[in-house]
Amino acid sequence: YVFADFDWLKEPRLIGELSYESLRGSDSYGFCYKDEWLKDYGGLFLSDDLNNYPGQQYTTPGKDIFGCFSDALPDRWGRTLINRREQILAKDEKRLVRRLSSFDYLIGIEDFSRMGGFRFKESMDGEYINASESLHIPPLTDIRELIAASSEIEKSEEEDQLPEMRWIAQLVQPGSSLGGARPKASVIDENKNLCIAKFPSRKDDYDAGLW
């Protein structure tokens, strides 16, 4: 179930249902608007590949997830964190590494820090996916520890080795939702605002933060 939690809504509203199917390594997605959403917000187009009418709609063959949801997907840094977490878990559990889809990336991101205004549930009366009463976004005062963790992860990438789980665990929730390739994480400042902290990279040949 897909909910809109846009800043101009008084409370989250159910938009529709997103479905996902993987067959022989090929992913397909379906979406169906709820009648109530179309009645109240039928003039609002969420994506150029979704028409505002009732009934099931599907992504075209060879196309990934609908555009409005792809905007919330992590970029290279976030995908690296999620991929490495899956590889470490697979090693610990003595199983094959799962091929992660856009759907896995979408729901693998922490609910509070996910880019955009979409929220997801597996059942109408359930909790939002990957949401927790204990906020997983660290305070700004943890910045040095986060920088150290990002440096260790970059080092392991250079050496083509898996990082320690403690470094991934420290960054995967606050860092996986953000775009771009540079190491970064979401943090909460002293005024409880959600901010983006960009870190130095081992690949930097100048002080990118100072620039």
Feature locations, PLM:
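Phosphate/dinucleotide-binding and metal-coordinating scaffold of catalytic cores
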Residues: 1-211
